[in-house]
A protein has these predicted regions:
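Surface-exposed beta-strand-turn/loop segments characteristic
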Residues: 44, 63-69, 73-81, 94, ...
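Surface-exposed extracellular loop regions of Gram-negative outer-membrane beta-barrel proteins
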Residues: 450, 571, 590-669, 686, ...
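N-terminal periplasmic "start-of-domain" segments of outer-membrane beta-barrel proteins
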Residues: 27-56
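Gram-negative outer-membrane beta-barrel transporters
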Residues: 690-826
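Outer-membrane beta-barrel transmembrane strands
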Residues: 93-94, 196-208, 217-221, 276-322, ...
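Cleavable N-terminal targeting peptides that direct proteins into the secretory/outer-membrane pathway or into
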Residues: 1-25
Length: 826
């Protein structure tokens, strides 16, 4: 039985008044993978028309793309925890920052200033203007620059529309709760219909005179949330087929002083508690409000030249809910004079006299007032382009353009807990009065267990205490990009027996990227108790100057060869050279073959270069934790664990603290891509088989915690470089505030993937009409990830792996993916 079963219901309605006219404008031809209009790329390329996209009934662009076997999901509206509020895709599973998104051949800017990630935001694409989508796999850095390692997705817009189009779309998700993994259907609706989404759009196109054309559009989307607890697949966070992953931070306070203490109970402390289902309140689909608007204005000038002005705007609000606020293993000083410590708890927590203080490790899930933490994203993106293209009297074609992009983000993290105020609220005297100088301080009682808000402090946590420790945090960020680009190209005819003609293109480009991130004082002071990622002020600026050349040869026997090179000089002292070579040859009237070989790069993004030192919780395990540690006592001693704490380190979760920062010495990632395609064009059928191989080296990644500990043990010296990266807390853990493993950012990892794509298109006649069958299948042959040069390869094929060594295996890697489409076309 499948884990996920849903039906996407939609209703679309449009009114369209269209004028058809003879095309007189100098129409720009968009060729994906080539800057020369007459030269076709030799890479595997998959194109989807507007009709094919609409048939799927998908509401978002990323939903359609993620359904294709060529693409793995990236960030999307289905992410809440660690969300950036953006949507991205991952071609061949190489990550969103290695999959370049283009609109009419021009790159979109980076998506979010929150994390500085280079992955572009699909929400910026004006989907009401899409004419077709081209997906080119394999590297193409020679044509588009950095980031095109996995390939490119090019959205080609309909810029010649004339008339008025008004559209309305309504949709929802239906799901049947019948999973065998949890007895979920016994206490939930057997069928749910939710996640209602609405879309309203208007497109207006007009030929203003014989020499100009204008298109304007506005597109509004409203998407309702879907909570995980409304689905059997999300009733809890599954741990394989064995049960649920639960949090050790529960409604029962956990207060520990070394080996003393535990979960608060009526008779003192207990050693265990029912775990907290942290996933239930999370959003499976984030609520989202989005407005896209813009225009394209073309003017034909003298001498067959053309001037184009275009502007695109995105205004978006989205909310990522991630469960109740909490304290997680925070070190807090508690006076033994605290009047809410019971007599049974007093000695059990390690108190001897009321004048004593204990340095406790405190965990607590604040469920009393039913608030959940939320990440609120308010994004505004603007992209303006001015382009001038034409042709000289000597038949040289030219195109120059300037693109200016700006994205701003107002990020709010709501309903967190102030760590400093919790410390104040627990630092009280025997009368229950706050000792701190904070005049607003309200005492909090964590020594009495209750699910509900207490009417007075002796019975538990009061509303006044919850109001006092309540905390909202915020970040303001900006990303801007400027592109200056120009190319000239020409076709040359040759009169010889071998070559018919050749094409040459020469170009140059300059890109400037800038990022600003300004967290508020609560972020800067690390006051948010529920934060998994630390945020500091960040400012970074990177620019690149590039020169490139493309050649195309057309032979008299119909063989076509294309080649290109690009040199890139970056402002932080790094440079890169990329190349590609390919051919296309029609063997006969039916069969043809094409192949490509290229080197592509990805240069470190602004965060990877400029990020200040920050700490975050990552999925990892401590081999020295628990009653039966994986390592022996002498090995754990090397990692900083005293012998007296061996077998006494609390193993509470699969999350440890990692500390990292940017590295200005990072080199570009490099990938060698190869492909070969066999194509058969029959009478009513077309078959294409594509073999691909991508080998990536020098992947920018953090050292994993497991690698640091492994190398520390292998060094056999606690003073080695590796062992000094490990900083345990006084209780020996790596999951308590103040503890961490330094995991520097280096060019570490290698990635190797290969596979086969099989594409079929076939028309057949039936009694009810002509039917078109389209099928695309991906067979994954190999997908291996190496954390570093000395590590053994991790097999990703057919797996989804979690942990600090998972790397690019973090995404599911199906062995076979297939999409079948059957349409009645006549």
């Amino acid at each position: 039985m499948p884990l996920l079963r849903y039906i996407f219901l939609n209703f679309s309605f449009s009114l369209m008044h269209v004028y058809v006219y003879a095309q007189e404008m100098n129409e720009e031809i968009i060729v994906t993978g080539s800057l020369i209009e007459e030269v076709q790329t030799s890479n595997p390329i998959f194109s989807s028309s507007l009709e094919e996209i609409n048939k799927r009934g998908t509401f978002r662009v990323e939903d359609y793309l993620n359904s294709l076997p060529l693409i793995n999901p990236g960030n999307s509206a289905l992410h809440s925890n660690f969300s950036s509020g953006t949507s991205s895709i991952s071609i061949r599973g190489l990550g969103g920052d290695r999959s370049l998104i283009l609109v009419d051949g021009k790159r979109l800017p980076s998506g979010s200033p929150l994390d500085g990630n280079a992955a572009q935001d699909l929400n910026q694409v004006p989907d009401v203007l899409i004419n077709r989508i081209d997906i080119l796999t394999g590297g193409k850095s020679t044509i588009y620059g950095s980031d095109a390692i996995g390939g490119v997705v090019n959205f080609v817009l309909d810029k010649n529309f004339i008339g008025t189009k008004i559209s309305m779309h309504q949709g929802a998700y239906q799901h049947s709760n019948n999973s065998y993994l949890r007895n979920f259907n016994s206490n939930a609706d057997s069928s749910v219909l939710d996640g209602i989404n609405s879309k309203y759009s208007v497109v207006v196109g007009s030929k203003l005179n014989n020499n100009s054309h204008f298109i304007g559009y506005i597109d509004y989307k409203n998407i309702d949330s879907v909570r995980w607890d409304k689905r059997d697949i999300g009733a809890c966070a599954f741990r394989g087929n064995s049960g649920c992953r639960l949090s050790s931070a529960t409604y029962m306070s956990r207060i520990q002083n070394g080996s003393n203490g535990g979960y608060v109970s009526e008779n003192g402390f207990s050693s265990s508690s029912a775990g907290f289902n942290f996933g239930a309140a999370n959003f499976l689909q984030r609520p989202d409000k989005r407005m896209n608007s813009g225009f394209i204005y073309d003017v034909n000038l003298a001498n067959k030249s053309k001037l184009t002005f275009s502007f695109y705007n995105l205004a978006q609000e989205s909310n990522a809910q991630i469960g109740a606020p909490l304290l997680f293993r925070q070190k807090i000083n508690i006076p033994c004079a605290n009047p809410y410590i019971t007599s049974a708890q007093f000695s059990n927590i390690g108190c001897v006299n009321t004048t004593d203080n204990i340095n406790a490790v405190v965990s607590k899930r604040f469920v009393e007032n039913s608030l959940n933490r939320s990440q609120f994203f308010q994004t505004s993106s603007n992209r303006g382009i001015i382009q001038y293209n034409g042709k000289t009297k000597s038949d040289w074609q030219y195109k120059i353009y300037h693109q200016n992009s700006h994205t701003s983000l107002k990020y709010k993290y709501l309903n967190d807990i102030s760590l400093s105020k919790v410390k104040n609220a627990l630092n009280i005297d025997s009368n229950g009065s706050c000792i701190s100088n904070d005049l607003d301080c309200v005492a909090i009682n964590l020594f009495t267990t209750s699910n509900n808000v207490a009417n007075n402090v002796t019975n538990g946590i009061t509303q006044e205490a919850l109001d006092y420790i309540h905390l909202n945090l915020s970040i303001y960020g900006e990303i801007s990009e400027k592109i200056f680009s120009g190319v000239i190209d020409r076709e040359f005819k040759l009169e010889n027996k071998l070559i018919d003609n050749y094409f040459i293109l020469i170009g140059g480009e300059r890109r400037e990227n800038k990022l600003i991130k300004l967290p508020d004082s609560s972020f800067l002071n690390e006051d948010g108790a529920g934060q998994q990622v630390q945020h500091q002020n960040m400012y970074g600026k990177v620019s690149v100057n590039e020169a490139f050349l493309q050649l195309g040869l057309a032979f008299k026997n119909n063989l076509k060869i294309d080649s290109s090179v690009r040199f890139s000089d970056y402002s932080f002292g790094k440079d890169a050279f990329t190349y590609d070579l390919g051919f296309y040859y029609p063997i006969n009237n039916i069969f043809s073959i094409k192949a490509s070989h290229q080197k592509s790069i990805r240069v470190a993004d602004i965060q990877e270069l400029f990020e200040p030192e920050e700490t975050e919780l990552v999925y990892a395990t401590d081999p020295c934790a628990g009653a039966t540690p994986e390592l022996n006592a002498s090995q754990c001693l090397l990692t900083g664990l005293p012998n007296n704490l061996y077998q006494n380190v609390d193993d509470t979760s699969a999350q440890l603290y990692s500390k990292s920062s940017g590295n200005f010495n990072l080199s570009p990632e490099k990938a060698i891509s190869n492909s070969i395609s066999l194509i058969a064009d029959l009478n009513r059928s077309r078959i294409e088989i594509d073999f691909y191989q991508i080998n990536m080296e020098d992947q920018i990644s953090q050292l994993s915690i497991a690698t640091v500990i492994k190398n520390c043990v292998a060094s056999e010296s606690s003073n080695s470089y590796w062992c000094k990266l490990i900083n345990r807390s006084n209780d020996g853990t790596l999951s308590t505030s103040g503890s961490y493993v330094s995991t520097p950012l280096f060019n570490l990892s290698n990635f190797d993937t290969s596979g086969l794509d099989f594409r079929l298109s076939h028309e057949i006649d039936t009694p009810i009409g002509q039917v078109l069958i389209k099928n695309i299948t991906n067979f994954l042959i190999k997908k291996d990830f190496k954390q570093d040069a000395d590590s053994d390869p991790i097999n990703c094929k057919g797996f989804y792996r979690l942990g600090d060594e998972a790397g690019l295996c973090y995404q599911p890697s199906p062995k076979i993916q297939n999409v079948l489409d059957i349409s009645l076309i006549k």
